[in-house]
UniProtKB/Swiss-Prot annotation:
Function: Usually encoded in the trnK tRNA gene intron. Probably assists in splicing its own and other chloroplast group II introns.
Chief subcellular location: plastid
GO BP annotations, alphabetical order: mRNA processing; RNA splicing; tRNA processing
PANTHER family: MATURASE K (PTHR34811:SF1)
One GO MF term: RNA binding
Family per similarity comment: Belongs to the intron maturase 2 family. MatK subfamily.
A GO CC term assigned to this protein in UniProt: chloroplast
Statement: the UniProt record of this protein carries the keyword RNA-binding: yes
Entry keyword annotation includes Oxidoreductase: no
Keywords for the protein's UniProt record, in alphabetical order: Chloroplast, mRNA processing, Plastid, RNA-binding, tRNA processing
Species in which this protein is naturally found: Soldanella alpina (Alpine snowbell)
Coiled coil region boundaries: none
InterPro entries given in the database record: Domain_X, Maturase_MatK, Maturase_MatK_N
Name of the protein: Maturase K
Amino acid sequence: MEEFKRYLDLDTSRQHDFLYPLIFQEYIYALAHDHSLTRSNSLELEKAGYDNNSSLLIVKRLITHLITQMDRQNHLSFLTNDSSQNPFFGHNTALYSQIILEGFVVVVEIPFSIRVISSLDLEGKERVKSHNFRSIHSVFPFLEDKFSHLIYVLDLLIPQSIHLEILIQTLRYWVKDASSLHLLRAFLHKYHNWKNLITPKKSSFSFSKRNKRFFFFFYNFHVYEYESILAFICNQSSHLQSKSYRPFLDRIYFYEKRDHFVEVFTKYFQAVLWSFNDPFMHYVRYQGKALLASKGTFLLMNKWNYYLVNFWQCYFYMWSQPGRIHINKLSNHYLELLGYLSSVGLNSSMVRNQMLENAFLIANASKKFDTTVPIIPLIRSFSKAKFCNLLGHPISKPIWTDLSDSDIIDRFGCIYRNISHYYSGSSQKMSLYRIKYIIKLSCARTLARKHKSTVRAFLKRVGLEFLEEFFLEDEFMFSLTFPKASYISGGLYRMRIWYLDIFCIHDLANHK
């Protein structure tokens, strides 16, 4: 990063093209290959004859030939639709073009990252550790604090299809480098030749998760534009002074949001600000979805629904079906949020009041944000991974019987601890106990099948401690976290605990 920063501090005569020379640096593609390409893509590179001595040279030759074709206005004719093998190079040009895109994203991320670091250094603020904001569980404390006081929620899917030229024009506000943007435009317009990279849709495209670094950067940038305008409207409609704020774009790549909006935004949105005078609007985004909750009326939520659909279509030229947005009442609707079923329910309590000789009961009702374990989807997932049947009855895992006993227990125990760890925030533990029972009995049946015995005979021979010692490791760590657990054990098992070290949800069937 220091090398990049010194390069960007050169004389201003070169700064308008400062990104373009970096595209030809070998360490950019080495960095992209080390951190971005998945294991499957690495295998594809090996099959295509990839090696450290020739790959970077081929990438440079591909860029040079691309520029030549652009100058001749031949529109990348060397990338054909019929074959991914190009006789000019003798290599998979689509694969190396993917490497160029990964390297381009690495280059474009540099000014964003340096801008964030420089702004923090100038203001004398301490850099916040990003991993504290990456946890999936960090969303739920906010929901507990805010959503229990709200009434309606807009459950919407963020459109992922965007017009190419709109994306390039938006990127121009941040990247003052015409040469790099022209190179990017040429690649994007030729993406229909490589169906493994994106899904074509006429003049627009849908982001693909196979090219992960490329996907995350442009998806975050696209959502950033949408959320910036949305935050601007919320601040203006509530008649509050717009303050500096620093939320992050995504929980994987963090770029600072800025509070400097173009003046045209103010003129453009003056006509719609009167419709959204609601100071109790809260917004949460997760996994391509978003929640927009309010204390307002159903009419206000309908206005937001109408505005969002037209905003995506008119400003970003994206078709958004009205059915992608649902208006629900929090009191009688469950939200499928990050593996939990969340709802806002009434928590009633009775208070006995004694005044002189008269005694009477007072009924109090308060709203509470509940998070429960979705037992049916979980059982369906365990059934698909062959841990139980569709009715939830545990079965053995035949594919693991070739492993050693310790490896089998280690795999089941890892799943057991991950489930216990992730669903520690559930307000109802009975469903979680059923899932734990499925894992334990499936482990016992797998071991019994390996030793050609029954579950009863196997456990009688090795003893229950053979499994309990391993599966109770999470409870042991829990007691270390709360030293007084023995005195309030009943209350602790009813508590919801959110962790800041959960970054992803792993597939049960894929153990690494």
